[in-house]
């Protein structure tokens, strides 16, 4: 250490306090990085790695740097790579410093705490989430620092908590240090993968410490006043988030003004599997927004509205009155295209007020940000005028909450120029006429520059030296330059400042006096402009709560306009959402598939489900016929209805559903080491435990991951359980290839059979995509194989084997005789079914009362007799 320069010693001392972050060390107009930080940053950023000085052992010190005024894209790239960035600024004016300039870290930028647009997706929240537990009670809190949104909840059990984490989709997660150890480490592994993780020691979760953090952030507020008195574990998670803010932002987040507690009973619950299978916000195949329900429904024109719509999709309502309020607003806007288009046009000019407010409150806003705020506020009176003319209750509420902030708009308009520069310290930000002192300094500056031009002309005339020039540089200031050939003509009052190879440089008392006046004015102008800008920014920050409230109302309005436009353009109907059990859809359509294949006519279908005679629908039919599409569309229509949206149908009667479950596919869990069949059983078990009579269950091909007999048995038992157990008797759509399950409708009054209509023509099949009553008579697997492009030889051979199987011609070990080879000779006549030693089988058969056998019992009996042979 003693061999190092003072600045390098200072760097290492500060770096020791932030070992997990790349330290941006301010040196003049640059942020510099040294040692391992420099090596890592140069690789990620693709910038030149150089070196400075030498260590005591003669080795070079790696170095790289970036201009401080254009650091945002570099920081964004590092954060995107999962790195933390500690911003170390000069804490005093270098001109005033005695010795090395004091420096300190002013903030640490992490993936979950970015606020600059370069690091953010406009229509996605950027959440920092904390999770902790007290026994089986899991507390969860999450914060979007860029908008100030801060929410907390408690959940029963780790799986419910992890499902909520997946839904929230945080960019960074805070966990207690115990989550590093088994078994919790393994249980959360799939959720934390590819996310930035920070572990806190147990003392951070001390209740008293967390209460102090909450009180400090929210001006003395208590758990009771924040509505969190019944969420003690969630409050510990909130404390962890606030502790992280103290660590990284010096606790400075004035726009985070409240905590919003919520309970899972307030919303229709959707587990991770259901969200994925229904492709609510991203497609299964590529994880993209386009092709998802969100991609279809999002016609918002503001970033705030886009984020709000995603929340509405992820958290459908359980409150009928709130649903009806949204429906009323959508209907009014749908029926008033002129108003709707006017609102959309006005909203399109509103910037992201939530994130502008965040940067303003965190003192990170630029003059461009204030200009964007001014532009947005200028549109609010016209928006209010449009909304005020509407009659729907929710639109009236939004109108009351939209605050034009006239005084702030006027302040910014008078203070900030129309098109301010990006760099604050360059000046040119404050408008003429706003501040008298600034106007006077600008006049001096302009007059001084004019004086220089006049003085040059005067001196040329006085000396007769036509090549005389008055110039300026940062070292000498203003000077008069005369070539060597003309030195003899200079007056006596010229004072030599510098000798060059071909010229001499001079000053005069008059030039020096004006230099001090002009340059002093320019320095004072920049300092005064920055000070005035800070005052305006602070005035805007003081209105943070009003800005946030207006931003939220504008986001809601944007979503309502978007949904009304979608309903109008797509011919959606207003569903009748009710407290009963009947789910009736007339001519329902899958919203996304209908949109993606708009050139073709989507075949609509009716649906009837209830908790009585139509409680469980068995759907049979071939692959590709449309079973999965039909079931998913029922789930999506139910979800859209509880969002308050209109739905793709001619008519819809939708009951409030507490949960939607889906059991489709297994690709998600195979990477976790679970077999396809194990995934099926785990998800099925979760459904059977969690479903209620108010739930909607979608089951697609239960039991296909094991042997036929096992699969049929499990599928049959699952269907029976969902029908017979009244606590878990959810409204269920059950697609299957096991035609044996159609027999359930004979013995269970709440089970009905439906199939996908198919027509055969020239040994080919035509999918009619229509759901009709009754079970399917064939599975058409070979025809589907032909459509998929299997070689004709394989198709022909499959037909032969199928005929053989259907005739029951089996050889030893149950192998179809023809399946062992086409040239196998036909079997010799069999004289007796039983040999001399088959008395046991004969006796077993005598015990059977055929008339009383169910199809499932018959299948199990055949399997038993087969093992006895």
UniProtKB/Swiss-Prot annotation:
**What HAMAP family does the database record attribute to this sequence?**
MutS
What superkingdom does the record give? Bacteria
Any one GO CC term of this protein is:
cytosol
Which protein, by its recorded name, is this?
DNA mismatch repair protein MutS
Described by its record, this protein's role is as follows:
This protein is involved in the repair of mismatches in DNA. It is possible that it carries out the mismatch recognition step. This protein has a weak ATPase activity.
Protein source organism: Geobacter sp. (strain M21)
Q: Which family does it belong to?
A: Belongs to the DNA mismatch repair MutS family.
One matching Pfam family, short form?
Answer: MutS_II
Keyword field contains Cell division: no
């Amino acid at each position: 250490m003693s061999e190092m320069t003072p600045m390098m010693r200072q760097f290492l001392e500060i770096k020791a306090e932030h070992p997990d972050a790349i330290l941006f060390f301010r040196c003049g107009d640059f942020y510099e990085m040294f040692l391992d930080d420099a090596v890592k940053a140069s690789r990620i950023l693709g910038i030149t790695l150089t070196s400075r000085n030498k260590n005591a052992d003669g080795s070079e010190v790696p170095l790289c740097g970036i201009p401080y005024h254009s650091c945002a894209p570099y920081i964004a790239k590092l954060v995107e790579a999962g790195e933390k960035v500690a911003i170390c600024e000069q804490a005093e004016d270098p001109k005033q410093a005695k010795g090395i300039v004091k420096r300190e870290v002013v903030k640490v930028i992490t993936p979950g705490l970015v606020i600059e647009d370069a690091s953010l997706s406009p229509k996605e929240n950027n959440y920092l989430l904390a999770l902790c537990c007290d026994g089986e009670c899991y507390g969860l809190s999450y914060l979007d620092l860029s908008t100030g949104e801060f929410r907390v909840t408690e959940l029963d059990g780790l799986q419910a908590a992890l499902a909520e984490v997946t839904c929230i989709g945080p960019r960074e997660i805070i966990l207690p240090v115990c989550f590093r150890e088994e078994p919790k480490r393994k249980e959360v592994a799939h959720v934390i993968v590819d996310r930035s993780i920070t572990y806190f020691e147990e003392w951070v979760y001390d209740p008293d410490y967390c209460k102090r953090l909450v009180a400090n952030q929210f001006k003395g507020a208590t758990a009771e006043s924040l509505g969190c008195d019944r969420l003690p574990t969630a409050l510990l998670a909130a404390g962890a988030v606030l502790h992280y803010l103290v660590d990284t932002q010096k606790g400075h987040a004035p726009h985070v003004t409240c905590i919003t507690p919520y309970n899972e009973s307030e919303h229709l619950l959707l587990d991770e599997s259901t969200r994925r299978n229904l492709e609510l916000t991203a497609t299964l195949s590529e994880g993209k927004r386009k092709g998802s329900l969100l991609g279809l429904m999002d016609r918002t024109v503001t970033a705030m509205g886009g984020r709000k719509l995603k929340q509405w999709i992820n958290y459908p309502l359980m409150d009928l009155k709130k649903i009806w309020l949204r429906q009323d607003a959508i209907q009014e806007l749908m029926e008033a295209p002129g108003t709707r288009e006017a609102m959309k046009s006005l909203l399109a000019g509103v910037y992201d007020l939530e994130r502008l407010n965040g940067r303003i409150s965190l003192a990170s806003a630029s003059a461009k940000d204030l200009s964007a705020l001014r532009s947005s506020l200028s549109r609010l009176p016209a928006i209010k005028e449009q909304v005020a003319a509407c009659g729907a209750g929710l639109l009236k509420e939004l109108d009351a909450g939209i605050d034009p902030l006239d005084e702030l708009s006027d302040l910014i308009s008078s203070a900030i120029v129309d098109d301010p520069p990006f760099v604050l310290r360059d000046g040119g930000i404050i408008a003429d006429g706003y501040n008298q002192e600034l106007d006077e300094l600008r006049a001096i500056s302009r007059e001084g520059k004019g004086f220089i031009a006049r003085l040059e002309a005067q001196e040329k005339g006085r000396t007769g030296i036509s090549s005389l020039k008055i110039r300026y540089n940062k070292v000498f200031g203003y000077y008069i330059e005369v070539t060597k050939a003309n030195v003899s003509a200079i007056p006596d009052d010229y004072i030599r400042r510098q000798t060059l190879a071909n010229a001499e440089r001079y000053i005069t008392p008059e030039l020096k006096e004006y230099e001090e006046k002009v340059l002093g004015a320019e320095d004072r102008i920049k300092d005064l402009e920055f000070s005035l800008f800070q005052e305006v920014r602070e005035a805007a920050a003081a209105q943070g709560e009003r800005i946030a409230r207006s931003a939220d109302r504008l986001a809601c309005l944007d979503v309502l306009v978007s949904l009304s436009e979608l309903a109008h353009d797509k011919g959606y109907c207003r569903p009748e959402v009710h407290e009963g059990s009947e789910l009736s859809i007339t001519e329902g359509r899958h919203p996304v598939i209908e949109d993606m294949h708009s050139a073709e006519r989507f075949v609509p279908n009716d649906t009837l489900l209830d908790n009585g005679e139509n409680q469980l629908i068995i759907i049979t039919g071939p692959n590709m016929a449309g079973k999965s599409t039909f079931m998913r569309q029922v789930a999506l229509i139910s979800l859209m209805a509880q969002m308050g949206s209109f739905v793709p149908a001619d008519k819809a009667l939708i009951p409030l559903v507490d949960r939607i479950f889906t059991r489709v596919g297994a690709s998600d869990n195979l990477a976790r080491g679970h077999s396809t069949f194990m995934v099926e059983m785990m998800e099925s078990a979760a459904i059977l435990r969690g479903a209620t009579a108010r739930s909607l269950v979608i089951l697609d091909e239960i039991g296909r991951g094991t042997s036929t007999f096992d699969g049929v048995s499990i599928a049959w038992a699952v269907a029976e359980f969902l029908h017979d157990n009244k606590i878990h008797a959810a409204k269920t759509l059950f697609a299957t290839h096991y035609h044996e399950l159609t027999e359930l409708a004979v013995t269970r009054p709440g089970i009905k059979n439906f199939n996908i209509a198919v027509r055969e023509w020239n040994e080919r099949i035509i999918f009619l995509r229509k759901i009709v009553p009754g079970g399917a008579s064939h599975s058409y697997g070979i025809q589907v194989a032909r459509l998929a492009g299997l070689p004709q030889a394989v198709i022909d051979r499959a037909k032969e084997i199928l005929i053989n199987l259907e005739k029951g011609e089996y050889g030893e070990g149950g192998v179809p005789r023809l399946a062992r080879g086409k040239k196998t000779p036909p079997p010799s006549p069999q004289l007796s079914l039983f040999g001399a030693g088959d008395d046991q089988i004969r006796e077993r058969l005598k015990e059977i009362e055929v008339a009383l056998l169910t199809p499932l019992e018959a299948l199990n009996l055949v399997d038993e007799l087969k093992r006895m042979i």
